[in-house]
């Protein structure tokens, strides 16, 4: 302040009144410009591409619009996905296996396309624009499905219409899944402790919002489809995604948008290509260079090769790009920051691979568990619960657990560990993986109990397979495994999203966050492969395959669940190997 006062006095003393006025105004404008620069978010703009300002853009208010939109978006998606097998088999003339394969392909494609949405948001557009375009595409697909369902035709043209609608929806869902979570997460200031805490809260409540949409989808919308007609169900989904757009736009004035920074895939391939080229060139050169004369010389060369610290082979391999930068062709020259970013991406990939088995468990329980419940007593008092409504149990449990975790468990963890996060992202993911092991063990025990009831009923009725009426065992036994799996999903999905977003370079955060959905897609695909492989192996030498028979009572489902439990345990050991060696790039302590 004293400096500015001295400058103004100097102007008044040595210049004319008119020139004094102009120079003082110029000085004031320079000060205003400096203030604006200091208050602007670096690398962020508002929806009109103007600099985003602190105190005006971002924060929990901006993220709250995203949470409401997620309720509507997931309602629109799951309302169809949860009951689509029944629609294809009863209305469109698909065989049970054909319907299941069609739904698996649709779900897997939708989740995989999240990678495309994340890539476009990082490279060329903002998450704001990707959401709006994706919502329009999903709305168009749902309109096609609504018209197709109203026609009730099984002609080939109707099936073409059906699949056009489904995959338009898949494309739209992929774009939304790839842009909406990072759009909400980027509203928080990661430079402050309060901003990081709010971002953690956001990811937990994102799962809560996702569960709210799922609850409405598997209850209200499924009831409409079963009792009023499928066009009503598709119509509700269409209305939900349409309403989500003005809700999303309502937050435009307070959003801050990350400026796209070019293709992260290009950077990834450029660095890897440069590393391979540098390694090849070094090997060619080493054939000419005289070898070390003494052991000390050799030790010195090894030290130079491992100058990247604790990264071992990865650090040595990618470090060549920096060390040999001047000798590389100009198109392959990379900055140290680019090499560092690629190193981070490679290090998070094993964590991503370790989560696929959990999602495979989710896929199995969403199919076989419903069939288990359909053979059991599904009455609660005078009310009969449809087996397709079983997903209500994990959804409701996740809705209860998410705020409990935020407001009770997390503060206790912070107090006991004296750290900002309380429980690290990798610990959250690991907790989810452990719960998935418990869920599969519980599923195996429940199926064993159910089979004992089947045997008892068969002996009492002198029949070989008791399946004509509900078994005298309540379906609530199956709900136990759903509770464990719902808990696993909450810990792992929220942990994955926050881990990938926080640890990924700022230039590829949307793409990295989309790995959470890609893991889900690979879990669905792997589940189909696993069932086929189990049936093939167990059916050798004229044995009965574990998962084939006239009905579920002839399956060896409990053996399959135990196999899943063992595989999940092995996968957890694989996860521990990588997680224990991972060094966070961000503040986790």
Curated annotation (Swiss-Prot):
Subcellular location: Membrane
Organism domain of life: Eukaryota
Example of a GO cellular component annotation carried by this entry: membrane
Entry keyword annotation includes Transmembrane helix: yes
Tissue: Expressed in flowers.
Alphabetical keyword list: Membrane, Transmembrane, Transmembrane helix, Transport
Pfam families named among the record's database cross-references: PTR2
UniProt membrane topology term: Multi-pass membrane protein
GO molecular function: transmembrane transporter activity
Residue ranges crossing the lipid bilayer per the database entry: 59-79, 105-125, 127-147, 160-180, 201-221, 230-250, 344-364, 383-403, 429-449, 471-491, 520-540, 560-580
InterPro entries: MFS_trans_sf (IPR036259), POT_fam (IPR000109)
Family: Belongs to the major facilitator superfamily. Proton-dependent oligopeptide transporter (POT/PTR) (TC 2.A.17) family.
Identification of the protein by name: Protein NRT1/ PTR FAMILY 4.7
């Amino acid at each position: 302040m004293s400096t500015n006062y001295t400058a103004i006095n100097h102007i008044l003393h040595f210049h004319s009144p008119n020139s004094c006025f102009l120079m003082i105004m110029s000085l004031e404008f320079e000060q205003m410009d400096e203030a604006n620069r200091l208050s602007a978010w670096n690398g962020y703009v508002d929806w009109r591409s103007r600099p985003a300002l602190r105190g005006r853009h971002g924060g929990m208010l901006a993220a709250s619009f995203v949470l409401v939109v997620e309720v509507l978006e997931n309602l629109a998606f799951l309302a169809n996905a949860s009951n689509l097998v029944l629609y294809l088999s009863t209305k469109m003339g698909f065989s049970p296996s054909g319907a299941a394969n069609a739904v698996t392909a649709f779900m897997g494609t939708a989740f995989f396309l999240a990678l495309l949405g994340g890539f476009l948001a990082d490279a060329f557009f903002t998450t704001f624009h990707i959401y709006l375009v994706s919502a329009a595409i999903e709305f168009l697909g749902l309109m096609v499905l609504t018209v197709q369902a109203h026609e009730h035709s099984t002609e080939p043209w109707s099936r073409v219409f059906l699949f056009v609608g489904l995959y338009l929806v898949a494309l739209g869902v992929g774009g939304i899944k790839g842009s909406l979570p990072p759009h909400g997460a980027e509203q928080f200031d990661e430079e402050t402790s309060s901003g990081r805490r709010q971002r953690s809260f956001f990811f937990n409540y994102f799962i809560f919002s996702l569960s709210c949409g799922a609850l409405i989808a598997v209850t209200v919308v499924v009831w409409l489809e079963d009792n009023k007609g499928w066009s009503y169900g598709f119509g509700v989904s269409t209305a939900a995604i349409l309403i989500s757009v003005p809700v999303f736009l309502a937050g435009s004035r307070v959003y801050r948008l990350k400026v796209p920074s070019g293709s992260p895939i290009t950077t990834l391939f450029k660095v890897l290509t440069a590393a391979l080229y540098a390694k090849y060139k070094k090997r060619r050169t080493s054939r000419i260079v005289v070898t070390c004369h003494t052991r000390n010389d050799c030790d010195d060369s090894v030290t130079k090769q491992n100058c990247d610290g604790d990264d071992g082979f990865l650090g040595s391999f990618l470090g060549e790009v920096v060390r040999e930068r001047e000798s590389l062709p100009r198109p392959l020259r990379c900055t140290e920051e680019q090499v560092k970013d690629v190193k981070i991406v490679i290090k998070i990939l094993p964590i991503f691979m370790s989560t696929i088995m959990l999602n495979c468990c989710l896929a199995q329980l969403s199919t076989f568990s419903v069939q288990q419940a359909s053979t059991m007593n599904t009455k609660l008092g005078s009310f009969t619960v449809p087996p397709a409504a079983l997903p209500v149990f994990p959804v409701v449990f996740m809705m209860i657990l998410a705020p409990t975790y935020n407001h009770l468990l997390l503060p206790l963890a912070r107090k006991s560990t004296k750290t900002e996060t309380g429980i690290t992202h990798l610990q959250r993911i690991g907790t989810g993986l452990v719960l998935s092991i418990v869920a599969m063990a519980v599923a195996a025990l429940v199926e064993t109990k159910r089979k004992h009831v089947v045997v008892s009923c068969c002996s009492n009725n002198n029949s070989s397979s008791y399946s004509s009426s509900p078994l005298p065992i309540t379906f609530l036994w199956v709900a136990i495994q759903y509770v464990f799996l719902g808990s696993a999903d909450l810990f792992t999905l929220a942990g994955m999203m926050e881990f990938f977003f926080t640890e990924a370079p700022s230039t590829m955060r949307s793409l990295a966050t989309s790995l959470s959905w890609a893991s889900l897609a690979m879990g669905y695909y792997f589940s189909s492969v696993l069932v086929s492989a189990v049936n093939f192996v167990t059916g050798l030498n004229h044995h009965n395959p574990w998962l084939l028979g006239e009905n579920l009572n002839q399956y060896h489902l409990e053996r399959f669940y135990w196999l899943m439990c063992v595989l999940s345990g092995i996968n957890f050991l694989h996860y521990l190997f990588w997680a224990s060696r991972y060094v966070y790039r961000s503040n986790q302590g």
